[in-house]
Amino acid sequence: MEKTVELLEQAGFRVDLGKHVLDRHGYLAGRDEDRISDLNDAFVDSEVRAIIATRGGKGAYRIADALDFAAAHNDPKLVVGFSEITIIQLALWQHANIPSLHGTPSAFYDGLLSETTYRACLTALSSGEPLHLRSMEDVPTSSLTTSGRAEGILVGGNLDMIVTGADWLIPKLNGNILFIEDVKKAGLGHIDRQMTRLLKSGYLENIAGIAVGQFTNFDTTDGWSVVDVLRDRLALIDVPILGGLPLGHGRDALVIPIGTHAVIDADEGTLTVEAAVR
């Protein structure tokens, strides 16, 4: 965390730490009531312009419906994070109509993230210009790319959290572009179950398109990779799909807005997203 604070201060930001940022409660980073207190204190503080998660946010789904959505809407701040922080970001988009930033500059101490990610985060935090991303052949999900063009609000992030919040916290994604990424928590069957649940529940009805990022650390099982599982499930949805995006849990992952207008051009292999900075 010290390195993260140092880098942000070098970039010109003033950094304040939440009262409970170093807490522990079992496998969680503090008690639910303390974590939600830190978040809501930040939402009502007019000097705070962004809230940056220091890690992935285990258990964020326990507190996502307790956010002060009125305060967040009245004085929007960018929540920066990924993994389980996705459910916080989607709740803010749905209930306060504010965008967030998917990605983080804050894990330098364990070597997971790079200078590329850090610079991408600074750009997303400070620039009002659209962000342009290109599908990369060395990201295995690039083979999922189909054809066509789609536009709408880019919504999503970590697949596990999208499924966790579906229906009870986040409504259907009519007319929007779904973005998914994930990292291995269990076997391929877990991804199959997640995608099947979204399909069978009707959650993905009338979506405009799908953007697919990194699915990292998954093993091959009986000749199938995680990309094979995704291809099998996504084949049931007749919308443009753009894979191979450098977004997620992999090294050099970029940072993009969630909850702003986006365009995917599968033929050109590009994703363009309006800035979250207003």
Walk through the language-model features, giving the residues of each.
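Short Gly/Thr/Asp-enriched flexible loops that form oxyanion-binding sites at enzyme active sites
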Residues: 56-74, 90-93, 225-228
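ATP/NTP phosphate-donor binding region
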Residues: 1-47
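Short, acidic/small-residue loops that bind anionic groups at enzyme active sites
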Residues: 67-91, 99-106, 237-241
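N-terminal glycine-rich "phosphate-gripper" loop used for MgATP/nucleotide binding
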Residues: 50-61, 82
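Internal helical hairpin/lid segments
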Residues: 170-226
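Conserved beta-alpha junction segments in alpha/beta enzyme cores
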Residues: 2-4, 149-185
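ATP/nucleoside-binding phosphotransfer catalytic cores, i.e., glycine-rich phosphate-binding loops
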Residues: 214-278
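Conserved anion/nucleotide-ligand pocket segment
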Residues: 97-161
